[in-house]
């Protein structure tokens, strides 16, 4: 019997006959417990185009991108001992941007996808609940989405399809890098770095978040 790579590496994927599920990796375990109305644990990546976004073409591009990222087609469920991601046949739908940035995506007991693609004028937004993926995964997804969009929007341009340097399996995409690379051994002589600059002032509640856009001449900077 031929054994797949996922089986060889002991990936925690179970086919129940109705759905597929997988445990959250170690770095994501805390997010479902601390998320709420004022702390959504959602982050945003966006791409600013030189042209206005066509919503219908963006939807077609998202459908294509989702075929390459089946692990994103999942809802967050709570089991007896842990949270887990369960595959669901829910179509990801593109929406015009109407909600405040990084609005709540995970609501307990609500079976909805953990990311949202929206657009406003020339901008394509990708917002995702942090338990689903990290910044690297989000960046790759958005890159793929924008590439698919531009190819569909400009078929006459014959734009190249940029492939990954090497094949990435579903197992690679769901690898628990925290367990693989984290070490509690911290060198005693580790060089101390300067603290990051912290913004001062009164912090707004999440519902008051908004996008501020400013256009100015480079010569004035």
Report the location of each language-model feature.
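Non-catalytic N-terminal regions of enzymes
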Residues: 10-179, 208-211, 215, 221
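Flexible, P/S/T/G-rich "lid" or insertion loops adjacent to the active sites of thioester-utilizing
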Residues: 177-221
């Amino acid at each position: 019997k031929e054994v797949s790579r996922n089986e060889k590496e002991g990936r925690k994927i179970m086919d129940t006959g109705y759905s597929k599920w997988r445990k959250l990796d170690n770095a994501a375990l805390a997010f479902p417990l601390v998320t709420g109305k004022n702390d959504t644990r959602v982050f945003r990546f966006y791409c600013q185009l030189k042209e206005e976004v066509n919503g219908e073409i963006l939807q077609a591009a998202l459908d294509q991108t989702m075929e390459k990222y089946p692990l994103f087609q999942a809802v967050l469920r709570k089991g007896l001992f842990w949270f887990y991601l369960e595959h669901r046949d829910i179509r990801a739908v593109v929406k015009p941007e109407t909600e405040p940035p990084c609005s709540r995506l995970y609501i307990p007991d609500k079976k909805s996808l953990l990311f949202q693609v929206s657009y406003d004028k020339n901008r394509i937004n990708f917002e995702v609940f942090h338990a689903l993926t990290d910044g690297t995964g989000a960046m790759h997804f958005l890159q793929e989405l924008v590439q698919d969009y531009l190819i569909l929007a400009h078929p006459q341009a014959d734009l190249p399809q940029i492939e990954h340097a090497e094949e990435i399996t579903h197992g690679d995409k769901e690898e628990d890098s925290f367990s693989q690379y984290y070490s509690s051994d911290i060198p005693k002589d580790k060089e101390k770095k300067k603290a990051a600059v912290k913004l001062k002032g009164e912090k707004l509640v999440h519902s008051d978040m908004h996008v501020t856009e400013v256009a100015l001449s480079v010569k004035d900077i």
